[in-house]
Amino acid sequence: MAESNDWLSVGKIVAVQGLLGELRVNPASDFPERFTVPGPRWLRSRQGGEPSEIQLKKGRQLPGKSLFVVRFEGVDNRSAAETLVGMELLVPADDRPELAEGEFHLLDLVGLKARLTADGPAIGTVSDLISGGNDLLEITTSDGRKLLIPFVEAIVPEVKLKAGWLLLTPPPGLLEL
């Protein structure tokens, strides 16, 4: 049985698109080929469990949106597609595109400590990523609050993966929301 860390979540199926079995995927990956290049992918239900393999037939990004529309083999109508809504789209954890120096995979940010100064204490830990118009980091503080921080260079100017932390320079009031 495969462990959960054997898999990399690249998106979540959020809705059906049309009548022919197409599905909308909210990506958790900066690599569009995860949703456009045919080949094997895996699905895992909301309850967890063992992922099941499915073949991606084709995909495209919706113009002006971060969502992708995908077609899977054997999913040819709306009813079949509706059974997949809410599932996580996975690839094997070792299926990671090569990155240039200084680049990183967004999912590698989960678990990093968030600091306000390079040598200061952590104010919390990155607990999730939320994809949308702009990516958001969900940071869970030591008292259990959840902060949503825009993942933009002006607010997150440094990411130190090997050291296990990132630097925040939030505008006044952002941490109080």
Curated annotation (Swiss-Prot):
Pfam families: PRC_RimM, RimM. Binds ribosomal protein uS19. Signal peptide: none annotated. GO terms for biological process: ribosomal small subunit biogenesis; rRNA processing. This is Ribosome maturation factor RimM. One of its GO terms (cellular component) is cytoplasm. One of its GO terms (molecular function) is ribosome binding. Keywords: Chaperone, Cytoplasm, Ribosome biogenesis, rRNA processing. Belongs to the RimM family. It is found in: Cytoplasm. Residues 101-174 form the PRC barrel domain. It comes from the Bacteria.
